[in-house]
Structure formats: structure tokens, C-alpha cells
Regions:
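Short beta-strand-loop
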Residues: 37-73, 91-96, 113-120, 143-152
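VWA/integrin I-like adhesion module and closely mimicked acidic/polar interface patches used
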Residues: 17, 73-87, 91, 108-159, ...
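Von Willebrand factor
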Residues: 1-58, 85-86, 103-107, 137-141
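Alpha-helical membrane and juxtamembrane elements of multi-pass inner-membrane transport
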Residues: 4, 65, 80-83
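Conserved aromatic
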Residues: 61, 158-161
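A general structural motif
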Residues: 41, 99-101, 130
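Sec/Tat-exported extracytoplasmic proteins
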Residues: 4-10, 22-33, 50-53, 71, ...
């Protein structure tokens, strides 16, 4: 599950970086050059958020054109409800089959100003699997809140601004 920050604080470079990153990882040919492509069996969910969860889109590993079009056609606006988006991701993964490795990747600047960490923590305690919640930062990232989320789920925070390829490789390598 990708939780994509489409809030107003991502306007400009942050959103451009996020958009480029998603186009890269969802493009089979480009991603396969770095051995990061999704397999045909992979299930991909993209949750977009700003002031609240805006959209939830689903695709299989090789059928990502519609996801890319939806992301490309989006405009950042609103505040930052990352906790709500991650909770939505946990709900989706908690209902999903045990046949898959489950991961949440938040792609954000980390300026969370809607919702509470305690809501996320309470939800996390109720999920049946230990699901890592990684963050890849963009724009003028605020990493403190993201580090707390990573600590909760035994994950990490990566800098998407300086070395996106390494961030993707590490996240994919942990799974």
C-alpha cells in the first residue's frame, strides 16, 4: 500500500518528486532495469490524502497505467492527514489474504497536522500481522513524526529527495 501525500504543503518540488517517484516504480520497464518491478501477482493499492483520505485505487503488478494516470492528474491541496491514510491502509491489509507480504509506504513531507498518533497506534495494535510502515520523504520533510511511526512498526524512514533508488531498493529488500 502506498499512502501518497497530496496535501498543500507538497505543492511544487515535493509533489513533483513524489509524482516522478511513482511514475518510476509503477513503470514496469523502468523499474525492471533496477530490479524493482512488481510481479504480475503483486497487489498494489494507492491511497491519496490531504485533509482526509481522497482516493483509494487498486491495481495488479503489471496493470498500473490507470494508477499512473490518476496520480498524474492530481493536484496537491489541503492539510495533512497521514495517520488517517495509514489507518485506511492497515484496514485494507488486515482484510487481505495472508498469501502476500504486507507493507505500507508513506510518501510524504511529514507535516502531519490532522489526526493523532494515538489513533494510529491503537489501530496498529489490533491488526493481525506486523505490518511495517515505511516513509519516503519529499519536499521540506519533517521526519520526527515519521520516525515515531517507523518505530511503532519496526520500519525506517528514507530520504526520497537525495537517493530515491536506494530508498526503493531498501524497502523492497525488506520484503
Amino acid at each position: 500500500v502506498f499512502c501518497l501525500d497530496f496535501s498543500g504543503s507538497m505543492s511544487g518540488d515535493g509533489f513533483d518528486e513524489l509524482d516522478d517517484a511513482m511514475n518510476y516504480i509503477l513503470d514496469y520497464d523502468r523499474a525492471s532495469k533496477d530490479k524493482l518491478q512488481f510481479s504480475a501477482k503483486d497487489k498494489i493499492t494507492v491511497i491519496t490524502f490531504g485533509s482526509h483520505v481522497y482516493n483509494t485505487w487498486h491495481a495488479s503488478g503489471h496493470d498500473t497505467d490507470e494508477l499512473r494516470k490518476n496520480i498524474d492528474g492530481s493536484v496537491p491541496t489541503g492539510t495533512t492527514a497521514l495517520y488517517d491514510a495509514v489507518i485506511k491502509g492497515l484496514d485494507i491489509l488486515n482484510k487481505d489474504s495472508d498469501d502476500y507480504t504486507k507493507t505500507i509506504i508513506a510518501m510524504t513531507d511529514g507535516n502531519i497536522n490532522v489526526g493523532t498518533f494515538s489513533d494510529l497506534k491503537n489501530k496498529y495494535k489490533k491488526v493481525k500481522d506486523e505490518i511495517p510502515i515505511y516513509s519516503i520523504t519529499f519536499g521540506s520533510a519533517e521526519e520526527e513524526q515519521l520516525e515515531v511511526i517507523a518505530d511503532l512498526s519496526n520500519a525506517r524512514v528514507f530520504d526520497g529527495k537525495t537517493d530515491l533508488l536506494t530508498a526503493f531498493k531498501k524497502v523492497r529488500g525488506y520484503n
